[in-house]
Amino acid sequence: MKLTCMMIVAVLFLTAWTFVTAVPHSSNALENLYLKARHEMENPEASKLNTRDDCEPPGNFCGMIKIGPPCCSGWCFFACA
């Protein structure tokens, strides 16, 4: 019983120590990530995720034999939708 209590106290202490000694600028990194995401929501052209240069436009063949980029829309039934 004493060993179990000591183990619980040790785990709680190590968990608290991890949070106390965490990198001080980690909250700043999260804030910067939030600001970047907010900027991309306000200005969709700024987002890199909206560009898909390596995809096939609608109407191009995309059957199982073809090895190449996927359809831009994500839908393929022998031709890109």
UniProtKB/Swiss-Prot annotation:
Q: Which residues form the signal peptide?
A: 1-22
What protein does this entry describe? Omega-conotoxin-like TxMKLT1-0223
Q: Which family does it belong to?
A: Belongs to the conotoxin O1 superfamily.
What is the organism field in this record?
Conus textile (Cloth-of-gold cone)
Q: Report the record's disulfide bonds.
A: 55-72, 62-76, 71-80
Q: Which GO terms describe its molecular function?
A: calcium channel regulator activity; ion channel inhibitor activity; toxin activity
Pfam families per UniProt: Conotoxin
In which compartments does the protein localize?
Answer: Secreted
Pro-peptide residues, renumbered to this chain, are 23-52
Domain of life the protein comes from: Eukaryota
One cellular component term from this protein's GO annotations in UniProt = extracellular region
Tissues/organs with expression: Expressed by the venom duct.
For this UniProt record, the keywords arranged alphabetically read as follows:
Calcium channel impairing toxin, Disulfide bond, Ion channel impairing toxin, Knottin, Neurotoxin, Presynaptic neurotoxin, Secreted, Signal, Toxin, Voltage-gated calcium channel impairing toxin
InterPro entries, A to Z:
Conotoxin (IPR004214), Conotoxin_omega-typ_CS (IPR012321)
What task does this protein carry out?
Omega-conotoxins act at presynaptic membranes, they bind and block voltage-gated calcium channels (Cav).
Q: What is known of its domains?
A: The presence of a 'disulfide through disulfide knot' structurally defines this protein as a knottin.
Give the main localization category: secreted
